[in-house]
């Protein structure tokens, strides 16, 4: 029986440890032993990648060119597009992502995700050990673009005449089904080849140089990506890894293979010349995921969402594909839930995952999680838990109930506020849409209601507590503006629904948490190689502005006076020692700058007298009379050692060279670490857990609105869908870089002008590390595809946020939610949805549900479960425990 311990890439880089008996850390051997079960996967994928096919089986470029001339797609000539598949499946937390990390480190491959969330999850995993290149979705890699979102899938159909169908039949069916997207990609790729754009001639140039230098063919092809950074990733490798592949429809498999051959044929890459074929490594769980397809019926103004066969189920269950891919020899199954530390709960999840027989013991275990639905739906119960529902309607109803509860309770910490969102509809485009769809009487109001899920992120538009839509017509601008208010909860947990720009402006946490940030360099690592200097400069700015917090802490009257006096002396000595020889600031200017940099524990700007405590020195002998001259006040404070000498001894600047930036950061870090050590020794946890906050400028929170004078010195970054944020409020502060980004979008001119005039507020979020950011608004264009016409119908402006207080079970997939309360719908129970909902938590102690689904009637994925159980008994399938 094969056993495996998943690869732990977080093993210490410095293996030698003199404190252990043999001088080495024993844990490193455990990490090495894990390779014996992962190694066969690597070896098999390498074998598949090295296979070459005869020249007559290599798809010719002329075949792709013929497709551009077709009038009726079903008449296209059948042609095999050779490929291999390796399948990696398993239940939640079994080690699939760790296996992807090993593949990335051991094989030159293209790592992708089925969705942006999946891609960002993979990137987060890969970045734990080494700096990782950005991970894109599989759609981005094969050439899918924004104008394809509204493409009409299934407009054409192909029906084979033989049973069972051949692999050529299956591929032709998928190409015809996905015709509008694939033919548009084909046109664009051929145009690039004709124009010489995108480095299409790079490989041909290298072939010519090789012949001139009498080098072996292909010996210089490895330099292609150095010479031209715009080469498609598909021309670099023939191993393509897709995480969460179960979310993709079956036609995407053929789309990936089609585009791989198309791009390599156009570029004449070495792998095309040598007859290599693509190896699609599909990672995911076929029993817990569903692929959904949406078709919008324009005549009915209704979106029709239907489940479709996903890639994993397609590969496993289709007999033709099973034989073509030899799936039994190219399948690895991970069957251990390492996230769950409870044996009974872990066994229950495995039973649900693989469709094993459900026993009375399983049902009794689930009985312990059941509470009344009214208990879950009462916002006063289970604070901090995430509610999961079957439908968006239930989510929206709970959010409305929660907001009403918070308004009545008058909770200052979790107060509610509303912000406007806008939709700008082009009148001329809307009139053209009505003509093309034969609906002259269609109103804008009805169109907005019917298309809200397409205009905005679907779950975002359905889950929010939204107000009444108000319409304004601006005929002179050719626009109708629809405005609606969305209610948010202050200090609640949220996620972003798309990648948004953010400007990091500060930090709010504790002295200990900020020391941890500086110690492990996680903040700098997350910036990537191109932004490290900016990260160091930003941290230096924060440290310099936040050093006054150490002196603010010493103002606490509950501290022992002797220890406070000693702290002042040691802080002054440390500062003089570290800053000797640095540029000094003028004394009076130092006081002003220091006061401006000071931030008290509540995040508000500290006044000069409070920041330096000129009149509140412990055991001060100067109590009867206070000098009125500012310089006399400062010298008095110097004598009492209560002034922060950093602002006297050091003039903060913004260095330009890398060495100066890094040197400044090391100096600021040394001051912070030194002060932290002094006060931690004297005051222990009362200091380390005390609030610490620092911003690039003075800030103040007026209810839910953040007021800040200047954002200069902020750090530009991305808000990712995989991160969890705390909603701190909103701000109207101008952010120049966001204004520039709006200008670059090249929206309809009148829409842009109205956006400037409306002055849309920006959200303020805090990430899990404590960094506070201003997040750009989510501005999206909506283009409708009708027949062969593309209409720029609307522009939407919202905040791209979705609450973690409640969501649908479908949207929770891939998220770790810790504390979960589930409301199932008794008449629509599916076992895979039950598994997804229950597996979001790592402990059964934090799981509640309104009913026991194992005692109700439910739908079971019998066919796929039978195939997986058969695979577990198949000696050719590689099983990893």
Swiss-Prot record:
It is found in: Host nucleus. Pfam families: Herpes_Helicase. GO terms for biological process: DNA replication. Gene3D superfamilies: P-loop containing nucleotide triphosphate hydrolases (3.40.50.300). It comes from the Viruses. Associates with the primase and the primase-associated factor to form the helicase-primase complex. Component of the helicase/primase complex. Unwinds the DNA at the replication forks and generates single-stranded DNA for both leading and lagging strand synthesis. The primase synthesizes short RNA primers on the lagging strand that the polymerase elongates using dNTPs. Possesses helicase-like motifs and therefore may act as the helicase subunit of the complex. This is DNA replication helicase. It comes from Varicella-zoster virus (strain Dumas).
């Amino acid at each position: 029986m094969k056993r495996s311990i998943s690869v732990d890439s977080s093993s210490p880089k410095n293996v030698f440890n003199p404190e252990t008996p043999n001088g080495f850390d024993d844990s490193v051997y455990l990490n090495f032993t894990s390779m014996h079960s992962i190694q066969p996967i690597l070896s098999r994928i390498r074998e598949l990648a090295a296979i070459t096919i005869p020249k007559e089986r290599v798809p010719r470029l002329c075949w792709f060119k013929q497709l551009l001339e077709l009038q009726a797609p079903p008449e296209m000539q059948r042609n095999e597009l050779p490929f291999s598949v390796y399948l990696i499946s398993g239940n939640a937390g079994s080690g699939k992502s760790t296996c992807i990390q090993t593949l990335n480190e051991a094989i030159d491959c293209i790592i992708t995700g089925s969705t942006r969330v999946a891609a960002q999850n993979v990137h987060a995993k890969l970045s734990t050990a080494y700096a990782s290149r950005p991970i894109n979705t599989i759609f981005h890699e094969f050439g899918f673009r924004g104008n394809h979102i509204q493409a009409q899938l299934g407009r054409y159909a192909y029906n084979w005449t033989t049973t069972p169908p051949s692999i050529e039949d299956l591929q032709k069916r998928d190409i015809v089904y996905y015709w509008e997207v694939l033919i548009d990609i084909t046109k664009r790729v051929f145009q690039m080849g004709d124009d010489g754009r995108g480095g299409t001639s790079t490989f041909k140039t290298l072939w010519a140089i090789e012949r001139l230098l009498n080098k072996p063919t292909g010996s210089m092809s490895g330099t292609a990506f150095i010479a031209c950074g715009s080469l498609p990733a598909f021309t670099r490798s023939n191993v393509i890894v897709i995480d969460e592949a179960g979310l993709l429809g079956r036609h995407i498999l053929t789309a990936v293979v089609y585009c791989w051959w198309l791009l390599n044929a156009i570029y004449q890459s070495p792998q095309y010349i040598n007859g290599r074929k693509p190896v699609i490594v599909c990672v995911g769980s076929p029993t817990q995921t569903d692929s959904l397809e949406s078709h919008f019926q324009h005549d009915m103004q209704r979106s029709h969402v239907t489940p479709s066969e996903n890639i994993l189920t397609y590969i496993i269950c289709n007999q033709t594909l099973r034989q073509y891919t030899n799936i039994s020899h190219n399948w690895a199954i991970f069957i251990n839930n390492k996230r769950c530390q409870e044996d009974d709960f872990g066994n229950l999840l495995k039973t649900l995952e693989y469709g094993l027989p459900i026993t009375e013991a399983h049902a009794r275990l689930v009985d312990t999680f059941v509470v009344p639905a009214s208990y879950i739906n009462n916002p006063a119960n289970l604070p901090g838990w995430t509610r999961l529902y079957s439908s968006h309607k239930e989510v929206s109803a709970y959010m409305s109930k929660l907001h009403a509860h918070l308004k009545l309770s008058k909770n200052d910490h979790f107060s509610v506020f509303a912000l406007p969102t806008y939709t700008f509809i082009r009148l001329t485009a809307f009139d053209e849409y009505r003509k093309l769809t034969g609906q002259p009487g269609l109103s804008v109001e009805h169109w907005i209601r019917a298309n809200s899920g397409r205009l905005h992120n679907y779950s975002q538009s359905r889950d929010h507590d939204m107000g009444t839509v108000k319409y304004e017509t601006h005929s002179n601008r050719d626009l109708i503006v629809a405005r609606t208010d969305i209610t948010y909860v202050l200090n609640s947990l949220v996620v972003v629904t798309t990648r948004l720009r953010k400007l990091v402006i500060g930090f709010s946490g504790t002295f200990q948490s900020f020391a941890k940030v500086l110690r492990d360099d996680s903040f700098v690592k997350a910036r990537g190689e191109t932004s490290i200097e900016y990260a160091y400069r930003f941290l230096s700015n924060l440290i310099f502005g936040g050093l006054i917090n150490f002196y603010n802490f010493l103002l606490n009257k509950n501290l022992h006076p002797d220890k406070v006096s000693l702290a002042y002396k040691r802080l002054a000595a440390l500062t003089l020692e570290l800053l000797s020889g640095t540029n000094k600031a003028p004394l009076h200017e130092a006081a002003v700058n220091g006061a401006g940099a000071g931030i008290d524990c509540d995040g508000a700007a500290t006044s000069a007298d409070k920041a330096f405590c000129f009149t509140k020195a412990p055991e001060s002998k100067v109590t009867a009379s206070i000098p009125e001259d500012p310089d006399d006040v400062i010298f008095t404070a110097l004598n009492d050692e209560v002034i922060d000498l950093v602002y006297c001894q050091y003039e903060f600047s913004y260095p330009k060279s890398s060495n100066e930036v890094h040197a400044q950061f090391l100096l600021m870090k040394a001051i912070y670490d030194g002060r932290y050590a002094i006060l931690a020794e004297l005051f222990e946890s009362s200091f380390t857990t005390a609030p610490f906050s620092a911003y690039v400028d003075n800030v103040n929170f007026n209810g839910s609105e953040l007021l800040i004078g200047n954002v200069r010195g902020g750090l530009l970054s991305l808000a990712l869908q995989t991160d969890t944020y705390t909603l701190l409020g909103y701000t109207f502060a101008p952010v120049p870089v966001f204004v520039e980004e709006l200008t670059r979008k090249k929206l309809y001119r009148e829409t842009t002008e109205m956006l400037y005039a409306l002055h849309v507020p920006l959200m303020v979020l805090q990430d899990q590390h404590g960094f506070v950011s201003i997040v750009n608004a989510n501005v999206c264009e909506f283009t409708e595809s009708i027949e062969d016409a593309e209409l720029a119908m609307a522009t939407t402006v919202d905040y791209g946020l979705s609450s973690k207080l409640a969501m649908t079970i479908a949207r929770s997939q891939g998220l770790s939610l810790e504390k979960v309360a589930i409301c199932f719908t008794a008449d629509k129970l599916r076992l895979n949805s039950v598994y997804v909902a229950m597996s979001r938590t790592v402990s059964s102690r934090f799981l509640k549900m309104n009913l026991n689904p194992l005692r109700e009637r439910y739908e079971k994925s019998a066919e796929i479960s039978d195939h997986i159980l058969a695979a577990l008994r198949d000696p050719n399938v590689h099983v990893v425990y």
